[in-house]
Amino acid sequence: MIVLVGLFSRTPKDPQSKKNDEQFKKFKKLVKEKKYPEALKLGTDYLEKVPNHHDVLFTIGGIYYLKNKFRIAISYFDKSLNIGSYDIDVLLLKAYSHQKLEENQRAIDCCKKIQEIDPKNKSVSDL
């Protein structure tokens, strides 16, 4: 009797996966080069294919934060926090965004969560 081990256990490679990886690398490069309009477009297109990519959500939120579009930034930070709720960087930028919008209680709530995660975080005291 012949045993075919592993022959049928291979999952097919997603052809879109390689394109997504290339698009993500290009997105990171655009952000590093501070080409934010192009990065926003590419990142938004990327999220249509990979909607729950934590880093892309956070980075797009950060770009909107830099553009003083705090409400839009918060929406991306919230999506990012749905994936990684203990990300201090996301919570901190979200707190700053709420502060800029004069939503002090929401900023305080973010700071409290940061202190729960990292009691020695110095950025919270600056806020």
Identify the meaning behind each predicted range.
Residues 16-52, 66:
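Alpha-helical segment of the N-proximal tetratricopeptide repeat
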Residues 46, 79-80, 113-114:
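Canonical positions in the second alpha-helix
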